[in-house]
């Protein structure tokens, strides 16, 4: 079979034999690809560090029966150094990579939008453009939108009556009106659903002065909605740093909190 080339984000890797690794890639045109990088663990490997997680690469592969084989790699963006040097950035980026792999779903299905979104999120984290928690929550909302799982925010999830509505129910699909509100729905504080809408739409100006309590509530709803659709928890989300250490570079000193809200 013929060689093929694609742009990819390295999601994870694990050892294979004495000198090789299996790498999981999120590619633009071929979706999830699992491939063998031969000799990558040797000191003089031709691949160097270009197949480490968080790398954005141009990769050439040889199709295999079960696993493809990496034949060439060129670095496009080296995010890893800026990400792994800080625990908060590292755990946030790990949650993004795990989410990308879970949402990408079947192997070989094109994932142009998800690839673009993932590269943008990693770049924003590495460059410390904004609060890491906001970058992560915006990524999760937009990734769910790509997958067709985005929570309804501006209308009722059940009857589509225009909002704003104050109640939210994960299993119902998001915000719900007073007529459709099921048992167990929560009523988040004023501003929480508005924050979620701003993150989804990229209205960053609307997120600048949002209190930490509202961020906490929004993060909890976003994580719950995502994990309900995935049908099991993400391993990396509980490790994400939240609060003061996460926001110090943005002049905010906030109490630490859990990823699930």
Curated annotation (Swiss-Prot):
Please report which protein family the annotation says this sequence is part of. Belongs to the RecO family.
Q: Which Gene3D superfamilies match?
A: Nucleic acid-binding proteins, Recombination protein O, C-terminal domain
Q: Which domain of life is it from?
A: Bacteria
Q: Which InterPro entries does this one have?
A: ARFGAP/RecO (IPR037278), DNA_rep/recomb_RecO_N (IPR022572), NA-bd_OB-fold (IPR012340), RecO (IPR003717), RecO_C (IPR042242)
GO annotation (BP), single = double-strand break repair
Origin organism is Mycobacteroides abscessus (strain ATCC 19977 / DSM 44196 / CCUG 20993 / CIP 104536 / JCM 13569 / NCTC 13031 / TMC 1543 / L948) (Mycobacterium abscessus)
UniProt-recorded name of the protein: DNA repair protein RecO
Disulfide linkage:
none
Annotated SUPFAM superfamilies: ArfGap/RecO-like zinc finger, Nucleic acid-binding proteins
Describe its function.
Involved in DNA repair and RecF pathway recombination.
What keywords is this UniProt entry annotated with?
Answer: DNA damage, DNA recombination, DNA repair
Q: Does the keyword Ribonucleoprotein apply?
A: no
One GO cellular component term: bacterial nucleoid
């Amino acid at each position: 079979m013929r060689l093929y080339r694609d742009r990819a984000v390295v999601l994870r890797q694990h050892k294979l034999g004495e000198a090789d690794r299996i790498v999981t890639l999120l590619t633009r045109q071929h979706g999830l690809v699992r491939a063998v990088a031969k000799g990558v663990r040797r000191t003089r490997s031709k691949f160097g560090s270009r197949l480490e997680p968080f790398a954005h690469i141009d990769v050439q592969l040889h199709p295999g029966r079960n696993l493809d084989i990496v034949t060439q790699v060129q670095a496009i963006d080296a995010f890893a150094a800026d990400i792994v040097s800080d625990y908060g950035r590292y755990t946030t980026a790990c949650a993004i990579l795990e989410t990308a792999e879970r949402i990408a779903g079947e192997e070989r299905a094109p994932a142009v939008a998800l690839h673009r979104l993932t590269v943008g999120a990693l770049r924003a984290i590495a460059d410390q453009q904004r609060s890491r928690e906001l970058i992560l929550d915006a990524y999760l909302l937009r990734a769910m939108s790509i997958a067709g799982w985005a929570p309804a925010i501006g209308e009722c999830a059940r009857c589509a009556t225009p909002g704003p509505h104050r109640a939210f129910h994960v299993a119902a699909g998001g915000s719900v009106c007073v007529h459709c509100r099921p048992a167990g729905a929560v009523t988040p504080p004023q501003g929480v659903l508005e924050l979620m809408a701003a993150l989804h739409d990229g209205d960053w100006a609307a997120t600048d002065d949002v209190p930490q309590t509202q961020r906490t509530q929004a993060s909890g709803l976003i994580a719950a909605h995502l994990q309900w659709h995935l049908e099991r928890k993400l391993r990396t989300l509980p490790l994400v740093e939240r609060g003061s250490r996460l926001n110090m570079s943005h002049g905010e000193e906030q109490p630490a909190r859990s990823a699930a809200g």
